[in-house]
């Protein structure tokens, strides 16, 4: 080791000395001595590596207190950061899907702060069942005989299959063997549930006779899967829920449908495209229906199974149910969300997801007009800033081919600055509250459909 590195190593202050510095004492009080000491040790190690590689101290060695404060702040920052979702996707899987209603937020806060009757009966002071209160509410809203709640819809499908058809055959149309995000595939779920898949029909056309011909003594379930994240047009045919239910009754084989997203209300009344409703399939005679809580329903992540009482009771008894059950926070948020559906005339105002989906294009246009002048003044030297019509998508596999007319602010790089859009997007992602748009067609788009606070967005972008 040369003389210079030796001198540099000797300039590294001892941990005890650093902890006694007046500028670091407040950090110890704020973050605790254990965390501060561990961070200082890591900083010392970083400095030693810098000396070894570059024969120089890091720049921050001139002010250990300031560098320590920055590292502690970064370390304590929450991993789940609030963001401005201006991506154009309303129910964005990567951004947490549905936003909670205020009543759901209050309900979660309450059950976090106090013991609650999660599995306790006040009537007889005995153990209760965590699903019963919500099951009654779901039955009231949908006409189902009974209901089961688990932690997501994938769990609902897995539990249903494991209960009804483990070791047996499940008949599904070839055109409905869906894959959703994260490589979640219906055939793979069947394998995990111990079922044997029997594909019938073709990719674009499946008839009732295809199901009928596949039935044998090993058939345990006739199943439909709603193709919520893609659509097949043209020369197509599919078996309706009523047809499948009729065949199931005649063959004494249960029937099920996985709706994926699903909606508890008729979306057409709000000017939105139609989405299958679980109560419709129950009315058609389908035995079991599964759907998500955090998509069009507008609630927390949850999987909901509705259907015939004897099948729901069997599902509740399955050992997997305990592994997949929902916790008290999920149940509280889901109950509060479902209670909003008891007052459908107020739903559009109280359910954030529905409110965002039903915003008129004129509302976003008006927002763009208010925001545009200040953004043009701030970014005009480097970017051409305009307001333009665009289309939002619902997201999370809901109504995949339908788009919602919206309005956006767009940023186009001036000539010769092609990489500046990526730099700008990266800069916005690094803000205290990141701003997330999308780059398309040589422009950075900020779709305003999900913008709730114009003032906060301007404060973020004009720094």
Curated annotation (Swiss-Prot):
EC number(s) on file: 2.9.1.1
GO molecular function, one term: L-seryl-tRNA(Sec) selenium transferase activity
Entry cofactors: pyridoxal 5'-phosphate
Localization, UniProt: Cytoplasm
N6-(pyridoxal phosphate)lysine modification, residue list: 295
Chief site of localization: cytoplasm
Pathway listed: Aminoacyl-tRNA biosynthesis; selenocysteinyl-tRNA(Sec) biosynthesis; selenocysteinyl-tRNA(Sec) from L-seryl-tRNA(Sec) (bacterial route): step 1/1
Keywords: Cytoplasm, Protein biosynthesis, Pyridoxal phosphate, Selenium, Transferase
Keyword Cytoplasm: yes
Keyword Transferase carried by entry: yes
Catalytic reaction list: L-seryl-tRNA(Sec) + selenophosphate + H(+) = L-selenocysteinyl-tRNA(Sec) + phosphate
Annotated function: Converts seryl-tRNA(Sec) to selenocysteinyl-tRNA(Sec) required for selenoprotein biosynthesis.
Subunit and partners: Homodecamer; pentamer of dimers. Binds only one seryl-tRNA(Sec) per dimer.
Family to which the UniProt record says this protein belongs: Belongs to the SelA family.
Name of the protein described by the UniProt record: L-seryl-tRNA(Sec) selenium transferase
Source organism: Photorhabdus laumondii subsp. laumondii (strain DSM 15139 / CIP 105565 / TT01)
